[in-house]
Regions:
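Terminal, non-catalytic domain-edge segments
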Residues: 66-175
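Solvent-exposed loop and edge beta-strand segments that line ligand/cofactor-binding
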Residues: 5, 48-64, 117-129
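Single conserved hydrophobic/aromatic residue that forms the stacking wall/gate
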Residues: 1-9, 14
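Long, well-ordered mid-to-C-terminal structural blocks that present hydrophobic/aromatic surfaces
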Residues: 11, 15-81
Length: 175
């Protein structure tokens, strides 16, 4: 997940800072991140959980970085509303941090995914790495009157689907 956001950021820097740099690479990377954001939003279960896979899982809510960045930049695809993304991300954050099992006695994040699980971290992971979880909080940089905060709350895709409500059909992505 962090590679998607890093690629878009790199392409944006190249586009903005290099004379005659083609905009097409940035646009392609941005569209791919938007598509990934749509998939990521669908991964969030009605209970606010998400699939546990990948070597970066100790970053916990850092997995929400692409959605957070899309919202912060105002790049959410038309298929995702601000209210929908806000409510889905909040559900994950509440589930992850609501019971304090992820913090040690001094209030610092522990190595693990949901609790102290140091065996799942890689040799290069340390307690500082865990603060990539804060990437989910990028929207906190948005003003209070931004649509991310003011749009009406909406159920996210999996919540609608499992609740028997109408929800958008997924589709193939073509460039």
């Amino acid at each position: 997940y962090e590679m998607t956001s890093s690629l878009v950021g790199s392409e944006m820097c190249i586009r903005d800072r290099i004379w005659n740099a083609p905009d097409c690479n940035f646009q392609r990377a941005q569209k791919r991140m938007q598509r990934f954001g749509m998939i990521l939003e669908r991964f969030i279960s009605p209970e606010g959980a998400f699939p546990v896979f990948g070597r970066s899982i100790t970053y916990r809510t850092g997995t929400l970085q692409p959605l957070a960045l899309l919202a912060w930049r105002g790049w959410l695809p038309k298929e995702l509303s601000n209210g929908q993304v806000r409510v889905a991300m909040t559900a994950v954050i509440n589930r992850m941090f609501g019971d304090n099992r992820n913090f040690n006695e001094k209030g610092f994040l522990t190595l693990g995914f949901n609790g102290s699980q140091p065996h799942i971290s890689d040799w290069y992971t340390n307690n500082g790495s865990l603060y990539m979880a804060s990437l989910a909080f990028l929207p906190l940089g948005l003003p209070a009157d931004h649509p991310f905060w003011t749009d009406a709350p909406q159920a996210w895709t999996s919540k609608k689907a499992w609740g028997g409500e109408e929800f958008p059909k997924d589709h193939a992505y073509y460039e």
